[in-house]
Regions:
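Amphipathic, interaction-prone secondary-structure segments
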Residues: 29-73
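Hydrophobic, Leu/Ile/Phe/Ala-enriched alpha-helical segments that form helix-helix packing faces
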Residues: 26, 42-46, 97, 104, ...
Length: 127
């Protein structure tokens, strides 16, 4: 039996659709919990990160991530010992994975959404 795995696609969420898009996925928990957590993780991972505009990406498998909208790398240092340079996209994916994992240990529907988003984004990252 042969199975063919399809590549997970990503699409930039247009500026005019950003608010509605994240509201449909996360509700008020996006601006109150998820977004600040992602920004904090990015700051912890990279002393090069000092804020800025983030691009929102919708994944073909239902996942979502956001990444700094700049064309440069970020020096990172992680608690697991990794030190190196990540692209802005890779920093965003990493920060979102950390945030989803952390927030998935809460209670209620938002924690479940974060757990699901973690696995969808991880699937994309490993693709």
């Amino acid at each position: 039996m042969t199975t063919t795995a399809e590549t997970i696609t990503r699409v930039l969420v247009p500026d005019r659709q950003r608010a509605d898009f994240v509201d449909a996925l996360f509700g008020l928990s996006f601006p109150l919990q998820l977004e600040p957590c992602v920004f904090a993780v990015a700051s912890e991972l990279s002393s090069d990160y000092h804020g800025g505009y983030w691009a929102f990406q919708s994944l073909g498998n239902g996942g979502f991530y956001m990444a700094p909208d700049v064309d440069r790398g970020f020096e990172v240092s992680c608690e697991n010992g990794f030190e190196g340079t990540l692209s802005s996209d890779a920093l965003g994916i990493t920060a979102c994975l950390y945030a989803y994992s952390h927030l998935s240990f809460g209670e209620g529907a938002f924690a479940e959404v974060c757990a699901e988003q973690y696995h969808l984004l991880r699937e994309y990252a490993l693709d």
